[in-house]
Amino acid sequence: MYDPARDCYQAEGESADARDAAEIAGGEFLADSATPETKSDSTKSDGNDPKQETSETKRPAYNYLPKIARKETTSGSRDAASAKPQLKRREREDVRVAGDRVAPRADMGSYVDYSEKESRERQDRDRDSRDHRDRDRDRDRGRDRYDSRDRDRYDSRDRPRDYDSRDRDRDRDRDRYDDRVRDYDSRERDRYDDRARDYDRGSRDSRDYRDRHDRERERYDSGNSRETRDVRESRERSLSPTREPKPHDPAAPAPSKQKRPSQRGGREAAAARAAQYRAEMEKREARAQAAAQQGDQVGDSLVRNHYNQAPERGVVARQSSPIIKLRNFNNFIKSVLIQKQSLGFGMRVIDMGCGKGGDLNKWSRQRVRDYIGVDIADVSVQQASERYHNMQPRPRFYAEFHVADAFGTPLIDIINPRAFPVDCISSQFAMHYAFATEELARSMLTNVSNSLCRDGVFLGTIPNSDKILEGIAGGLKESEPKEGEERYGYFGNSVYKVEFNTPPTKDQAFRPPFGHKYTFYLQDAINNVPEYVVPFEVFRALASDYNLELIYKKPFLEMFDEEVKNDLNMARLAERMKVFKEDGSLGIDGDQREACGFYLAFAFRKLGA
């Protein structure tokens, strides 16, 4: 029956005092082990209760169940120290069995459990509604834990966002990287300037700097003092075509075996005539050299003025040029030459005849370390510097530009000596100006040889002398007369034209090999600028005198066909640079193809130290 004072059910005849004594003793209290007082009390019957049991059929009053029901304890004001023993005591608490319902003590919290005989409907009806709330709360708590793990696993910048946010983050990261690169460049530049100031005012290390500078000047003055013994001996054994045989001296006497005193007067007269002849020849050479220098100065001024007056065109104007296919083709050839013949990452490069800086992006893709541009046209150098500072993305290499003649002036007088030696020297569509005289050509090769390190590379593009000979042999067209100028004839087409003011050579070689002048015209690019023929075999033999070995030589058209056919990456590069024919295939056709065939590419390697 239910006891309101204890808030639980108790069996008939149960003694409360005996049960409390059992709780205090901690033992099991069963009907079999009850005291006489308890048995006598248990045999008492209540007349009002219809359910009375005899002593033979009495069920045990208490029994431990193997499974304790789910509970909700309310500790109230009890502290943590007293709550733990109380919990253990509740685990040992016996449960009153009344019928088929299990009910806990009042001080044990609210237990809810049912026997196997209870129906599912009654379980659902009597189950506490708070159980559902607990299950929902646990499910939400688990979902929160999963979300927190997901937040910890992925950074906030890696989550899908709108394109504007990603662009802003990318720009921010790029700006941070550019700031680091700019800070590094500024530190390097400041350190470079500090060393230069120490060198100028004479610091502790100035003596070593000046001695090194003097040694460099001696190397330039001596022509090529770093050549090896084997190279020098091979050069002395080989006959260079640039060295012409000396003319016959008519005043020189015939060799005679007579040694009589009567022959002394004749020998003295012959020696006097020979000295007079040599003096006349020296005067003639001096006049010719002065005329050549005057012509070179006029030619240099024309070249300088032409490139200074050429306007700087934007990307849109260049794309609308009538020779855009030729420009794309030439840029592709230069890109392939730089990519395949240069040394690779971390180079220090000198560009002789840098112009407006059209090759800055090509060298940037090679990840060079330093770029030094030298050109005779001051306006072009200024435009090249502006192009470098406006490059997007910002360049990762240091660049400096100088206005000077890279062929006739020693580079050590133009560039700081600490920049030498360099890994690569490039001269794109400019080296033919150095073949105006032999002295200028040798000065150019001296700069190249003395500036390169061991195994350094000298590469460039020049007009093909074989194509010039073919054009002359095919017959020259008559030039239109013009007042104040002498014109002999020309060959070419609507895109380019090579015109001679004097009758060109008729044989298959240019003798003498220097000073063969012609006027070159290229549509929308070059307007009748004087240039000079570069006989390539003469150039190769002359370069061997300066420890430069030829490693590559290809005309433009052959080079394009070979690279596109054998290298898939080069074919993809040609597609990106839009080198297409009219039918959409790779290449160039029409008059622009003939103009591209006018040039060739070369590369030399520096031998020795």
Swiss-Prot record:
Keyword hit for S-adenosyl-L-methionine: yes
Top-level EC class: transferase
Record key words, sorted: Methyltransferase, mRNA capping, mRNA processing, Nucleus, RNA-binding, S-adenosyl-L-methionine, Transferase
mRNA cap 0 methyltransferase domain mapped to chain residues: 321-607
Site positions for mRNA cap binding: K356, K362, R387, H432, E531, Y599
Low complexity bias locations: 268-278
Gene3D superfamilies, per database record: Vaccinia Virus protein VP39 (3.40.50.150)
Region annotation (Disordered) ranges: 1-299
First-listed, main subcellular location of the protein, grouped into a coarse class: nucleus
InterPro entries the UniProt entry points to: mRNA_G-N7_MeTrfase_dom (IPR004971), RG7MT1 (IPR039753), SAM-dependent_MTases_sf (IPR029063)
Residues binding mRNA: N330, N331
GO cellular-component term (any): nucleus
Ranges of compositional bias, category Basic and acidic residues: 38-59, 88-104, 114-249
Subcellular location: Nucleus
Binding site for S-adenosyl-L-methionine: K334, G353, D375, D405, Q428, Y433
Family under the similarity heading: Belongs to the class I-like SAM-binding methyltransferase superfamily. mRNA cap 0 methyltransferase family.
Identification of the protein by name: mRNA cap guanine-N(7) methyltransferase
Record organism: Yarrowia lipolytica (strain CLIB 122 / E 150) (Yeast)
Gene, per the UniProt record: ABD1
